[in-house]
Amino acid sequence: MTPVSSRLQPLIIPCVDIQSGRAVRLYEGDPDRETVYFESPLEAARHWAALGAGLVHLVDLDAATGRGENRAVITQITAELGVPVEVGGGIRDRAAAEALLDAGVGRVVIGTAAVKNPALVRELIAAHGPSRVVVSLDARGLDVAIHGWAEGSGVSVAELAPLLAEAGLETLIFTDVTRDGTLRGLDRDLMRQVRQLWSNTLIVGGGVATLDDVRLLAEEGIQGAIVGRAIYEGTLVYPVTGL
């Protein structure tokens, strides 16, 4: 049997979720079920950068849920961290996306706006290139959720994937919201379904708990994962080795 390591080494991207100015993780995306890991999101990002992260994923949870925003904190991290960041949460239109890109963010992560208006993705890619625009589909099963996972969208990953590919999207983030922040591990069958629906770069946005989940990503041909609680609590040691 060919070793997993010779097939694929998934990229593990540390996540810093920001709520009320602090670095937190939520259980299944519920803003009222938070665990605070760092009082300073900048210190959280610096922690992962010091351990070798080449990319840090930032999420403005307050903007995603309409409770406020943490843009000043994100701008500070972008300016001071020294490694690229990608930013998602509450980016509802082209102006918001371009403000972040102009501030030096490596790439923007579009969620609800991409579901409601796939043409926005095409516009941003045409203006800034596919390397600076990512779409995140957050779903229960294959049913996509919007507005900080609080509402169903009425559309599925199967419906959206071809529209996004046609728009020129190269990288898709898929989050199983029923697993995010739970340390329950990945649903292999669901990961396989999504992999079949999206042939370009696929990043899993939640559910990785242990090294076995990273191995699962490699086995299913998934290029990486955004990881939060598992590396904060040590069920997965970062940087990841031992594949």
From Swiss-Prot:
Keywords: Amino-acid biosynthesis, Cytoplasm, Histidine biosynthesis, Isomerase. GO terms for biological process: L-histidine biosynthetic process; L-tryptophan biosynthetic process. GO terms for molecular function: 1-(5-phosphoribosyl)-5-[(5-phosphoribosylamino)methylideneamino]imidazole-4-carboxamide isomerase activity. One of its GO terms (cellular component) is cytoplasm. The keyword Amino-acid biosynthesis applies. It is found in: Cytoplasm. Coiled coil: none annotated. InterPro entries: Aldolase_TIM, His_biosynth, HisA_bact_arch, Isoase_HisA-like, Isoase_HisA-like_bact, RibuloseP-bd_barrel. The active site is at residues 17, 138. Its EC number is 5.3.1.16. Pathway: Amino-acid biosynthesis; L-histidine biosynthesis; L-histidine from 5-phospho-alpha-D-ribose 1-diphosphate: step 4/9. This is 1-(5-phosphoribosyl)-5-[(5-phosphoribosylamino)methylideneamino] imidazole-4-carboxamide isomerase. It comes from Deinococcus geothermalis (strain DSM 11300 / CIP 105573 / AG-3a). The lineage of its organism: Bacteria, Thermotogati, Deinococcota, Deinococci, Deinococcales.
